[in-house]
C-alpha cells in the first residue's frame, strides 16, 4: 500500500512539474513575440545612433569631424522622439476610433449591445476565474510541497523509529545478560563472604590463643630481663668502684709523657692527639649493653646518661696527653679536670678562669674569648701560667665546642707545656 501511494505521488509530482515548465515556456514566447512586434520600428534609429558611436574608436583624428558626429546623433534623437509621439497619437486615435465604431454598432443594434454586455460580463468572470485558478494552483503547489515535506518527515520518523526499536531490542538483550551475570556474581560473593567469615572466625580463635601465649611469655621474659638488668647494673657499679680504687692507689704515680716533643711540632701533634680524644668523647653513647633496660618499660635515659658520664670521666683520667678539662660556658662551671692541673701547676681549673687570681699571667683575654666562643672550629693559642713549683711557665692550649655526645655544646680542652725543660725540672721534684 505504501509503495502504491509513493508511486502515485511521484507520478503526480512529475505531471505537475511538466505542466508548469510548459506553461512557463509558452508565457516566455508570448512576451518575446510581443516585444519584437511592438518595438521593431525603433530598430533603425537605434542603429543610426549606435553606428557612429561604435565606429568612433576606430577613426583617426583627421577623419573625425565633430559636426558629422553630432548631426546623426541629434537627428536620430529627433527621429526617435517624433516616432514615439506619433505612435502614441496613432494608438490613442485607433483606440478612440475602435470605441466609437463599437459604440455606434451597439447603439444601432440592441442584440449586439446585449452580446457586448454579456461578453464583458463573461470576460470579467473569466478574469476572476483565472485569478482564482492561479490562486488554487499556487495553493496546490504549496500543499504539494507541504505534503512532500511531511512525507519526508514521516519516512525519517519511521526509519528513526525502526532504528530505535532495533537498539531497544539490543539493549534489552544486553540488560538481560547483565542481570544474569549480576545474579551469578551475587551468589558467588555470598559464597565467598561465608567462606571469609569462617576463615576470620578461625583466625580470631588462633589470634586469641597466640595473644594469651604471647602475654604469658612476655610476662616471664620481663621478669627474667629485670633480674638480669639488676645483676648487670650491680656489675657495672662494682667495676666503676674497682677502677676508682685502683686509680686512687696509683694517684701519685701519674704517667708523664715519655719523650719530649720538639717545640716546632708541639702544636701540630697536640692538635692531632686532641682530635682523637674529641672523636672518642663525641661518639660515646649510653650503655647499650644493658639488655635488661632495653626490654623493660622503665625510662633508662637518666641512668644511661649518668653511667655514660662516669665511664667518660674514667677514660679521660687515664689520658696523659696533658691537662684535660670539660667546661660548660653557659653555666660557667667546670665539669671535669684531670689530676695534672694540681700536679703540674698546683692550681685547679677554676683558678685559670678567674681574672683576679693572677694564675694566667699573659694571654688571658684570648684564652677567655676562645672558651666562650660557640664555634665548632678548633681554637689554639699560648698562655703563660704562674706555677707554684717553677713560676711563670708557657703552655699551649687547644679547645673545641663539642657537637654531639653526652657533653654536646660543652667545651673540651687541653693544656700542654710549651718547653721540654718543664718535664726535666718536673722529674727532679
Swiss-Prot record:
Top-level lineage group: Bacteria
InterPro entries assigned to the protein according to its UniProt record, in alphabetical order: UPF0242_N (IPR009623), UPF0242_PAS (IPR040578)
Protein source organism: Chlamydia trachomatis serovar D (strain ATCC VR-885 / DSM 19411 / UW-3/Cx)
Family statement: Belongs to the UPF0242 family.
Protein name: UPF0242 protein CT_616
Amino acid at each position: 500500500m505504501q509503495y502504491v501511494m509513493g508511486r502515485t505521488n511521484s507520478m503526480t509530482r512529475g505531471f505537475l512539474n511538466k505542466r508548469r515548465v510548459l506553461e512557463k515556456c509558452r508565457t516566455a514566447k508570448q512576451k518575446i513575440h510581443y516585444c519584437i512586434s511592438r518595438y521593431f520600428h525603433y530598430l533603425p534609429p537605434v542603429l543610426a545612433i549606435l553606428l557612429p558611436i561604435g565606429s568612433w574608436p576606430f577613426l583617426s583624428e583627421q577623419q573625425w569631424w565633430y559636426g558629422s558626429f553630432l548631426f546623426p546623433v541629434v537627428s536620430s534623437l529627433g527621429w526617435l522622439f517624433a516616432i514615439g509621439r506619433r505612435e502614441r497619437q496613432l494608438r490613442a486615435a485607433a483606440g478612440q476610433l475602435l470605441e466609437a465604431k463599437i459604440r455606434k454598432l451597439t447603439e444601432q443594434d440592441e442584440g449586439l449591445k446585449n452580446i457586448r454586455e454579456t461578453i464583458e460580463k463573461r470576460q470579467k468572470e473569466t478574469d476572476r476565474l483565472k485569478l482564482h485558478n492561479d490562486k488554487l494552483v499556487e495553493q496546490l503547489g504549496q500543499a504539494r510541497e507541504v505534503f512532500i515535506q511531511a512525507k519526508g518527515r514521516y519516512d525519517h520518523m519511521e526509519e528513526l523509529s525502526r532504528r530505535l526499536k532495533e537498539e531497544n531490542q539490543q539493549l534489552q538483550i544486553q540488560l538481560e545478560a547483565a542481570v544474569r551475570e549480576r545474579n551469578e556474581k551475587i551468589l558467588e560473593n555470598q559464597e565467598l563472604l561465608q567462606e571469609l567469615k569462617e576463615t576470620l572466625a578461625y583466625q580470631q580463635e588462633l589470634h586469641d590463643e597466640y595473644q594469651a601465649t604471647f602475654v604469658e611469655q612476655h610476662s616471664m621474659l620481663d621478669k627474667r630481663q629485670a633480674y638480669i638488668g639488676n645483676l648487670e647494673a650491680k656489675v657495672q657499679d662494682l667495676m666503676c668502684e674497682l677502677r676508682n680504687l685502683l686509680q686512687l692507689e696509683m694517684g701519685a704515680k701519674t704517667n708523664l709523657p715519655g719523650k719530649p716533643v720538639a717545640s716546632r711540632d708541639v702544636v701540630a701533634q697536640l692538635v692531632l692527639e686532641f682530635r682523637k680524644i674529641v672523636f672518642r668523647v663525641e661518639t660515646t653513647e649510653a650503655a647499650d649493653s644493658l639488655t635488661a633496660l632495653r626490654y623493660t618499660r622503665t625510662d633508662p635515659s637518666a641512668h644511661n646518661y649518668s653511667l655514660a658520664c662516669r665511664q667518660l670521666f674514667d677514660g679521660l683520667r687515664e689520658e696523659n696527653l696533658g691537662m684535660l678539662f670539660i667546661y660548660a660556658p653557659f653555666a660557667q662551671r667546670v665539669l671535669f679536670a684531670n689530676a695534672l692541673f694540681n700536679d703540674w701547676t698546683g692550681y685547679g681549673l677554676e683558678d685559670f678562669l678567674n681574672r683576679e687570681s693572677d694564675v694566667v699571667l699573659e694571654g688571658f683575654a684570648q684564652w677567655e674569648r676562645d672558651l666562650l666562643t660557640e664555634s665548632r672550629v678548633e681554637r689554639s693559642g699560648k698562655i703563660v701560667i704562674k706555677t707554684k713549683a717553677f713560676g711563670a711557665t708557657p703552655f699551649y692550649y687547644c679547645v673545641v665546642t663539642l657537637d654531639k655526645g653526652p657533653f654536646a655544646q660543652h667545651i673540651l680542652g687541653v693544656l700542654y707545656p710549651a718547653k721540654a725543660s718543664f718535664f726535666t725540672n718536673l722529674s727532679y721534684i
